[in-house]
């Protein structure tokens, strides 16, 4: 948020909250506005105020939840510490709302169990359980067989082991256009295409062709002067071709991209800076595309024990 562009919109409804509400068919009055926006600007303002209390907004939210006899879902920050500056860290919210906590934990390897043990120590009985997320697909079975029982023995109920999905991690071409401030040279109407992987065309063309054949749904970043790489990328599973540096694409390249319906983007950044921006985009997964939401529902149904979760939350919900 840039204060020079005006005040924050009110109510402050997160885009993900809006999408979920539309997907589930919830009325607008069922949405709970965010209390604060986490950003360097607001953090600086908060530091200057020297106030670490949640404030009246939290009290109003707590009353709103108390007045509703249904199920309320709150997404908290990504760590136990985030939000302390606002009095809204995960432990503070759980305590203030008398709420149970389900942790969706980014699984790396067994060393990442330390974070789960720390959460259990901090949250105590408020920690209902965990879901292990973004697990390498080939490791799901071994985790369910070995790691899950071990965690259960440590008092950490595991309600699911979710495999990593390139589709869910994907971003649209339009999102890359926005983040890169790119100029769309052709196929502007194809910005809804999903990019699952990133490839950098900095090798010789023979190596590039072999590499491209092993990838799918790529964004290929290469220099504007590497016409050999550019044409090779168009013949592979490429969702968009991103040209960096000085120079313009050849007319023949534009024509071929139009024939294949591959968006051609031109950016002012160098290759390294462009790759960094794209990797940041992959790190902020959004489910605002219907195909991703549908796939996410299917993954949850297949890999999560919702019956156990509902039982732990004392919810009278039947899962078929």
Residue ranges of model-derived segments:
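Phosphate-binding/switch loop-helix module in NTP-utilizing enzymes
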Residues: 44-86, 91-96
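Generic beta-sheet signal
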Residues: 70-74, 101, 218-222
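Non-catalytic interface/targeting segments
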Residues: 156, 161-223, 280-320
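Flexible, charged surface loops at secondary-structure boundaries
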Residues: 65-68, 209-218, 233-237
């Amino acid at each position: 948020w840039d204060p020079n562009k005006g005040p924050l919109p009110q109510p402050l409804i997160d885009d993900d909250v809006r999408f979920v509400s539309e997907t589930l068919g919830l009325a607008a009055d069922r949405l709970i506005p965010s209390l604060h926006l986490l950003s360097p600007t607001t953090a600086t303002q908060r530091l200057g105020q020297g106030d670490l209390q949640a404030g009246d907004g939290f009290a109003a939210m707590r009353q709103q939840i108390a007045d509703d006899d249904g199920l309320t879902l709150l997404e908290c920050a990504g760590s136990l510490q985030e939000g302390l500056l606002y009095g809204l860290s995960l432990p503070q919210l759980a305590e203030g709302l008398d709420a149970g906590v389900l942790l969706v934990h980014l699984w790396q390897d067994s060393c990442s169990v330390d974070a789960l043990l720390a959460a259990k120590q901090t949250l105590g009985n408020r920690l209902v359980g965990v879901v292990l997320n973004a697990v390498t697909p080939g490791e799901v079975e071994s985790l369910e067989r070995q790691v899950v029982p071990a965690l259960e023995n440590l008092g950490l109920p595991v309600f699911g082991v979710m495999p990593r999905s390139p589709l869910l991690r994907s971003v649209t071409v339009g999102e890359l256009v926005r983040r890169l401030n790119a100029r769309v040279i052709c196929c502007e109407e194809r910005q809804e295409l999903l990019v699952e992987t990133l490839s950098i065309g900095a090798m010789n063309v023979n190596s590039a062709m072999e590499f491209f054949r092993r990838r799918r749904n790529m964004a290929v970043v290469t220099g504007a002067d590497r016409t050999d790489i550019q044409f090779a990328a168009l013949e592979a599973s490429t969702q968009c071709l991103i040209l960096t540096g000085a120079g313009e694409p050849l007319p023949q390249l534009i024509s071929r991209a139009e024939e294949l319906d591959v968006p051609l983007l031109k950016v002012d950044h160098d290759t390294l800076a462009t790759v960094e921006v794209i990797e940041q985009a992959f790190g902020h997964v959004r489910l605002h595309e219907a195909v991703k939401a549908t796939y996410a529902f299917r993954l949850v149904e297949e890999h999560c024990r919702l019956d156990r979760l509902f039982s732990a939350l004392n919810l009278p919900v039947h899962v078929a």
